Each structure stands twice: as structure tokens, then as C-alpha cells.
């Protein structure tokens, strides 16, 4: 797996750079069984469509609620000799997991989303976000890995525009 946190829309181009530098095909449709499953999570997954072609799946809401089940599913699937596409179909059946390749978004002339059609029975008609109601039950890393280097520590974010330009 390659997990990417989507904190800000302005960081989307960095995702492409990470994939390119890792020699992972940019588009999920071009990946083989030998490539990692690219997973998106974080606040920007509430509007995943602009970057959906680059991700195999998204956690909708808080991934801590479901990631153990997803990992167990993956391990069992690999042990059984399953392929990438069948794993993604099984993953889509888990609550809070959105697999873009299993849906056909349709847009209006103005570019807004008009409908969202599942392409297979495993894909639910809608994907509901997951919320961890009691944070005390969550597993957290005691000592997160954050590189102590200038490029990481000496930076700031400047947001020039906020909100949707389409009203």
C-alpha cells in the first residue's frame, strides 16, 4: 500500500510527483498486480473526483475506523492468490471505502456532478463517511516519523483563494 493524506487541494501536484518518483504508473487504470494499491485519505477525500484517476481507493471519513479490516481483507486476498481488480471489488464492499474505478461519474454542462453510477454489484450506490465517535479507542503512533530537515521544518502554507468558484 501507498497511503497519501490529502490535506489541501494545492498539494495535488505533489501526489503526481510522488507517484512519478516512485515509478508507480500515474493512473490507477495503468497499474498492474505488482504495483502498490494507492490509497487517499484526509479532508480532501470529501471531493475525490478531481484526483480519482490517480487513486485505487479512498478512505471516506476517518480511516482508523476501517483500516484494520481493509488490511485483513488484503492479506487474506493475497494468500488466496487474488488479483488487484478482485481485491478492489471486495474493498468497495467495506463501509467508508470508495473505489473510483467501480463508478461512472456523470457531469452537467457546467461541470458539476449530476449522477454517480456503480459499475458492478460490489460497489454500493453511495459511500458513507466513517466517523470515530470515541477517539480514546483509536490506535495512534506514539512517536510519528517527521524528518528533521530544513525542507520539512522551515515552511509555511499560503492559501490564496478559498471555496468553490462555481458557487
Predicted segments with their positions:
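Glycine-rich beta-alpha loop elements in corrinoid/cobalamin-binding modules
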Residues: 1-119
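N-terminal [4Fe-4S]-dependent radical SAM core
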Residues: 111-160
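Local cysteine-cluster metal-coordination motifs and their immediate loop/turn environment
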Residues: 159-167
Amino acid at each position: 500500500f501507498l497511503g497519501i493524506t490529502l490535506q489541501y487541494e494545492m498539494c495535488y501536484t505533489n501526489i503526481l510527483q510522488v507517484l512519478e518518483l516512485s515509478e508507480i504508473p500515474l493512473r490507477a487504470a495503468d497499474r498492474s498486480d505488482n504495483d502498490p494499491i494507492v490509497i487517499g485519505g484526509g479532508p480532501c477525500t470529501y471531493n475525490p473526483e478531481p484526483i480519482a484517476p490517480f487513486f485505487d481507493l479512498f478512505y471516506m471519513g476517518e480511516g482508523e475506523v476501517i483500516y484494520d479490516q481493509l488490511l485483513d481483507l488484503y492479506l487474506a486476498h493475497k494468500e488466496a492468490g487474488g488479483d488487484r481488480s478482485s481485491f478492489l471489488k471486495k474493498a468497495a464492499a467495506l463501509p467508508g471505502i470508495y473505489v473510483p474505478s467501480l463508478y461512472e461519474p456523470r457531469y452537467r454542462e457546467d461541470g458539476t456532478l449530476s449522477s454517480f453510477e456503480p459499475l458492478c454489484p460490489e460497489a454500493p450506490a453511495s459511500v458513507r463517511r466513517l466517523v470515530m465517535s470515541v477517539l480514546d479507542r483509536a490506535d495512534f503512533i506514539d512517536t510519528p516519523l517527521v524528518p528533521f530537515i530544513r525542507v520539512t521544518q522551515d515552511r509555511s502554507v499560503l492559501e490564496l483563494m478559498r471555496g468553490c468558484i462555481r458557487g
